[in-house]
């Protein structure tokens, strides 16, 4: 039995196998994951429910704060629900209840084991796991225990409330504290078997505080869950690409391999293993561009690096980083088939690297140089974006952003923009309203020399849909304490007024209040035959039209019998109104 002692897996690089996302596969070919098809008898029933085949989790009753306790509990629930909601998977979670105050991580400790997957905030000390581990400097920390066949047996997650402040309101975009739904979503990635992703805007990547790209699962995590926990026959509908990365005929370990779709979005990224091989599985069929780029040296500081081997996992500390990035190679992926695409890279230190991102701003001098992915909304225009490094060219280079719906102005050079000597290359960017949402990449080119920041700019969709139900999360969050709850689903009718949440969203009414109704009368046409009333409706619902004459204190009288709507609009002809002024109203019936 082997155990993890870090947020990422501490394993030997020589035995490592990776996929599009980063997982651990042992020498026997076993993938690190929960066995939800035929749960291992050695896994306690308090950890995995063998009847429902769901991973059970418990939330510590003493949350981060007492004032915001309910929202914090619901944020934890929402994170598990988002992972479970990825279409086409068997991944399932169920809440087991609350764990008592003072709980600790102890997965795999034969003496202290409690057979409980727990999520809690450490509030008194950064020493956890019985004092064995210090989480100082870490926002979150996940410990998993797994058997020799790589079956996860138990896992615990702790969030650091000693050194960090936490909040739950995803609309509070100015808050620089830690968003529960970002960090915990990241940690659950480790909880189910993932290491850090090399894709900048992935959830299981190095994320920024506050509300940013880490919130909501990326295409990289979607591919990961579909590969680790697929429904029967799912993988036969998805494509894969594999190959080797070589330099002078020798294997290149730890090279980043990135798949970019036809829209210019990074859909998956991985790193090559010790024999130079890589695999990008569980990708939707279609046309892709694949490229290979070096990670930054593990000896580089945070400000002198964007993504290092040690940022992915300790196993990649000695990743080969002295080779030049490649150009893109096109490939068409077909469902149920694995294509092969090999790369031969050229040795040598890249002339320049990107080691920081300047987040979008409408101010020309609001420059930043963080290691985190940035976000921009579709339809935004005249925003400055940029990349940072001490090695970037100070002239004669071009900054571009991949993908459709993007126009970018001339490159602006700001040598020594930062006190530590880093240069800035920036440009004005415009994002079309119909730009395909997803993770874009920054590219700097000078002659034949290239540098990439893969997936470090997220183009946001018109509305967030973190739980993959095709419905606007903001509406669900506004009216439901837990936006992933069954009663918040688009076709649910929690107030039992006969209208679904989706209909009430479209008409601007409150789905939790049966007295909140709205269906507009769209037109009233008077002819010799009478008055024709047309109003908005919901198919299958019953409506009654009422009218009254233009006489003071007159009462409303029904016009004809109730009508059952057959579409989004309904009509009624009132023949009695051919020669008199009348007022109309429409009432939805139970």
Task: State the predicted function of each range.
Residues 18-69, 125-152, 234, 318-325, ...:
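Disordered inhibitory propeptide/activation segment of secreted metzincin zinc metalloprotease zymogens
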Residues 22-29, 72-187, 191-195, 256, ...:
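Metzincin-family zinc-dependent endopeptidase catalytic domain
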Residues 239-247, 276, 343:
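A short, amphipathic beta-strand motif
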Residues 241, 247-270, 284-287:
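Short, ordered, surface-exposed loop/turn motifs in non-cytosolic proteins
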Residues 295-340, 563-565:
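Structured interaction patches on ligand/partner-binding surfaces of diverse proteins
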Residues 348-401, 411, 449-464:
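Beta-strand/beta-sandwich contexts
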Residues 378-448:
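Immunoglobulin-like IPT/TIG beta-sandwich domains and homologous Ig-like subdomains
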Residues 462-590:
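Short, composition-biased motifs enriched in small/polar/acidic residues
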